[in-house]
Each structure stands twice: as structure tokens, then as C-alpha cells.
Amino acid sequence: MRRLQCGRPEERRPPAAPPMVRFVLLAAAAGGLLWAAAAEPDSPMTTSTPATGPSSPLSIQQLQTLMDKLRPLYARLGEPEPGDWLYHHKEPGQTFRQYVASDPVRPVGKRTVIYIQPLGEFTDAQRRIVTLTAEFLGLYFNRPVKVRDDVPLSVIPARARRTHPTWGDKQILTGYVLDEVLRPRLPEDAAACLALTASDLWPGPGWNFVFGQASLTDRVGVWSIYRNGDPSGGEADFRLCLLRTLKTAAHEMGHMFSMLHCTAYECCMCGSNHRQEADRRPVALCPECMAKVCWATGANPAQRLKRLAAFCQAHGLEAQQRFYEKALAILK
């Protein structure tokens, strides 16, 4: 299994390179055991977002032409500072054409639905974040989304938990969630299944925490709301938590469709090594990564931007709304 993540390694030593690639939004490492026993999928509680059916899938060249129009709108990545993701993790990046040539995981055949798997308990405000994130992912990836019935944290055994030795945070092991909770429960029509938890995440030895982690090949991922702030603290706090959660969810879902970290532009698919770096990343995809999503899902770029702008307007994400509207105006 190939995995990606973003996250915070322990300060005392660099993490040993594991035998697989991983991906997460803010802290990460892989690990985990394979579970051979299969289980019947749980019947999901569906809060569906219908697919935003495109007029017609665009060709690679048509997408390339449209994305070239958008390039002036996006900031190129500068030299990373000490502590930033790319300062510590040298990554090659991935162009749109490299992505197409890689035979990526994408929604094909009967595998067309994105599933959100709540893991553990949530407050009412956190539950609303889950619902809005499901709606956003449907618009972002042009897929119907179903939210499944909750799975309790009691499914995580003691060997896949720890208390952080310095901070005291209670954490669950991401590899166990991917391999032993999600993979055996993967529905037959799942384009991807992404677990969301209010628990802190930990990917294994050498790492302090991760915001999320996903498999590049197995259609499963997990991300956490734990470090995104308290959404019940007021409207501004709710919007901040929502935006952070949307970024992580979109980033991890991108990995589940075989998208690597972006190294060219300020982009939702950039790796992040700490909270400040994650907060300065946009929720929007750069031209290269947007082309990947539109090609993989059959989304019409202009329709996608219009729907995302409307979502941001409805939920008070004004800066994000303005950006999507600027991009839409260029394509028109």
C-alpha cells in the first residue's frame, strides 16, 4: 500500500523512511497491519450530495488549454523556510500529464460514490462540520457523497492507541484505521472512503501527530478535526474550523485519487509540516491539480468553480468565494 501524509515529525530525530510512501496534510508517517478478514459493509446513513454532472468530459488538451488561462491567478511556491514541509521532505511534484500517465485511482465503473465514515463521538457543532464537509467534497470532486453510520472508537484496540509522551494528547494510529477499520468495510460502489474523527491522529514511530493520512492505491483515508479549533466558540471559530477541515478533507481525498503533493504552486495539495503552513495553504487547487480532478471525475471546470463559489458564499468563506469567482470569470 502506498501512502502519503503531511505532519509533524518528532524533533529528536528524523523519521526512518518506511517501506511505503504516505500522505497526510500536516503530520505523518505510515504503518499499520493488514487485516485479512473481510467484513460486510455497514448500511450507510446517506446525506448525499448529488454529482455535478458535467456537460461532457473534456479532453486532456482542452483541460490543458483552460488551465493555462488560469495560471496567472496562482502564486508559485517560493523557497521553503526551515520547518516547512518541502524544507524537510524533498518531493518531485506531479504535473497533470504525469498524473494521467500514472494510471491513477479514480471513480470508474461501479465505484462512483465518496463515503464519509464518522469515527467516535462528535459535538453538535462538529457534527455540522461533518455534514458541510460531505457537501463540499461532492462539489469539489463531482461525486455523490454518503455519510455512513458512526463507528465507535472502541473498535480501536489498546495496541493502536497512545498518549503522547510530551503533550499528553490521546491519539489513535492511522495505519490501523486504514487497514483494519476502513478496508474491510469498503463498500463495493466506493470511489473512496474517508474516516473523520475528533480524536488526535498519530502515524507511528518518529512522528508527533498527523492531520490526516490516505492510501494512494486502496481508496481509504482518515483525517481529524482535533487540531482545527473549537467550532462551538462562535461564528468566526466555526468558520475557521470548517475551512481547516475542508482543506484537510480535500487534500486527503486528492491523495486517494493518486494525486501527489504539489510542489509548483500554493495549492490545497501542498504538503504542510505545521499549523501556520497549513493555514496559509488555499483550499483551491492550482491549475495542474484542478486539471487532474476534472479529468479523473469528468467535472466541467467552470461548473465546478461556480458551485464551489456558491458554497463558500453560503457559509461565510468570503476570501475563498472571491477567488473562485475570479477563476470563473477568467474561464468565461
Residue positions per predicted region:
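Surface-exposed, flexible loop/turn segments at secondary-structure boundaries
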Residues: F122, L201-W202, C294
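Low-complexity, Gly/Pro
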Residues: M1-G7, E11-T52
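Generic domain-boundary/flexible-linker signal
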Residues: A125-R127, G204-P205, R280, T297
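Active-site-proximal segment of zinc-dependent metalloprotease catalytic domains
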Residues: R183-E252, M256
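N-terminal low-structure segments adjacent to metalloprotease catalytic domains
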Residues: A37-L186, A190-A192, L196, R304-K332
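A short, structural micro-pattern
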Residues: K110, P187-E188, L216-T217, T263, ...
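Metalloprotease/metallohydrolase-associated module, dominated by Zn2+-dependent proteases
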Residues: G53-Y74, G221-R239, L243-R244, H261-K332
